[in-house]
Amino acid sequence: MFLFSRKTKTPISTYSDSYRAPTSIKEVYKDPPLWAWEANKFVTPGLTHTAQRHVDPDALQKMLKCAVQDYSYKGSIPSHPYFPEKYWLCPEEADRCNPNYLCGNPNYLCSNQYNTWRMGPYNCWNKCTTYLPRLPKEAGMETVVRGMPLVYPPKPERLNAYEREVVVNMLNSLSRNQPLPQITPRCGCVDPLPGRLPFQGYESACSGRHYCLRGMDYCVSGPPCTERRLRPLCTELPTVRSVSPCEHRSGMQCAVITPQPSYYPCPNLRWDTSHFKKTGGSQRNNYVVHPEFVSETYPDYHCW
């Protein structure tokens, strides 16, 4: 039988053989364990730097190419009636389309490495045109017209009177260094205005070439002889071969340079090439006048 003290709650035995010295149960303060500094499982871990992984550029390009092919060929509209998968040939159909099918060679597809275009999805042709289904009726003419090639009207070779006057006035202003005159619009192809004679080109005495307008007879005001042939801007320069030797030194040849004539207001057209285009590669002094000008395509027309 044990008795407990109220203060210490120490068991006291009534028997001497079971006596035990009284001890206090007062708790002694100790440092808390290190569990407070351990990782807290209930706290969300923060962001950490991912390890730098090696990226193969070739594999990346291959993946990109495959993604582009999938997007291009499968289409973005699920209900589109023309999926390319519908037109790939299965081995049986490819065998029937094979020209050697009737020759008794059924293993031609398996042995021919160049025959994969019949069944491949991307780098291949699709089915033959005879295998393609008809266009849906609800598509209407809009689908048919979208697939037709555009036919452009032919370029007219001859110009009407209004266009003729525009081009001729431009040429006259370039040759005389004058501003463009005011053009009165006219509709339709009418006869040339009174006092204008048809021409097919003009000659430049400076360059010695004949300039023509392709596909038209343009009209220039004034007599034909004065409008067709430009006034000579520079006389023929004698060269070393054509000049006699100088008198003060025997056996020496030199070129005689004559000054430019001052009676013509326009600068030398030989070097004024702002409205000209040089052609012929290394060929000198060969120009084509815009628009639609071709040099040396017509013979030399004399005044009539």
From Swiss-Prot:
- Chief place of localization: cytoplasm
**Bilayer-spanning residue ranges:** none
Q: Report the superkingdom from the record.
A: Eukaryota
Q: Which GO terms describe its molecular function?
A: alpha-tubulin binding
Q: Which InterPro entries match?
A: SPMIP6
Compartments annotated for it: namely: Cytoplasm, Cytoskeleton; Nucleus; Cytoplasm; Mitochondrion
GO terms for CC?
Answer: cytoplasm; manchette; mitochondrion; nucleus; perinuclear region of cytoplasm; sperm midpiece
Keywords attached to this entry? Cell projection, Cilium, Cytoplasm, Cytoskeleton, Differentiation, Flagellum, Mitochondrion, Nucleus, Spermatogenesis
Pfam family membership, one: SMRP1
Q: Which GO terms describe its biological process?
A: cell differentiation; spermatogenesis
PANTHER family noted in UniProt: SPERMATID-SPECIFIC MANCHETTE-RELATED PROTEIN 1
Give the similarity note. Answer: Belongs to the SPMIP6 family.
Functional description taken from the UniProt entry: May participate in intramanchette transport and midpiece formation of the sperm tail. May play a potential role in somatic cell proliferation.
- Subunit note: Microtubule inner protein component of sperm flagellar doublet microtubules. Interacts with alpha-tubulin.
Q: What is this protein called?
A: Sperm microtubule inner protein 6
- Native organism is Bos taurus (Bovine)
| UniProt lineage | Eukaryota, Metazoa, Chordata, Craniata, Vertebrata
Gene encoding it?
Answer: SPMIP6
